[in-house]
Amino acid sequence: MKTKQLVASEEVYDFLKVIWPDYETESRYDNLSLIVCTLSDPDCVRWLSENMKFGDEKQLALMKEKYGWEVGDKLPEWLHSSYHRLLLIGELLESNLKLKKYTVEITETLSRLVSIEAENPDEAERLVREKYKSCEIVLDADDFQDYDTSIYE
């Protein structure tokens, strides 16, 4: 299986995940819009630098361990290029805006009151079941009562 070539180094993605821990998997449109707006802003690098201290603590610890980077240090030079940030935006939208397929079950409830002559309630229910199974009683759209949906992941 061929893996997709990323537009930036692992270090760049690690930096972005300080601010956006779900950067690579984000699918909420409002969050994606915020990421795109920030990356497209000419003042992006300054904003990222100033806000790193509020970022994900685990990711900040990883940055220190992996790259020796601490809050206040310079961000990767690669992020300073508007062109490079546009590449990130394109990659982000291409991979995260894909529609996903879901299976949804629809359950309709049809109901009809049926009168039948019988010796007792059990026999009445048995006779109605037999008539229903043999298609002597057919429920249709006029018998619709309710519906429900359930999602399967």
UniProtKB/Swiss-Prot annotation:
Fill in the misc note: Encoded next to the DpnI restriction endonuclease.
**What's one Pfam family here?**
DpnD_N
Gene symbol of the encoding locus: dpnD
Note whether Ion transport occurs among the keywords.
Answer: no
Which key words tag this protein in UniProt?
Answer: Restriction system
- The domain of life for this entry's organism is Bacteria
Q: What is this protein called?
A: Protein DpnD
Per the UniProt entry, what species is this protein from, by scientific name?
Streptococcus pneumoniae serotype 4 (strain ATCC BAA-334 / TIGR4)
According to its UniProt entry, the protein's GO biological process terms are: DNA restriction-modification system
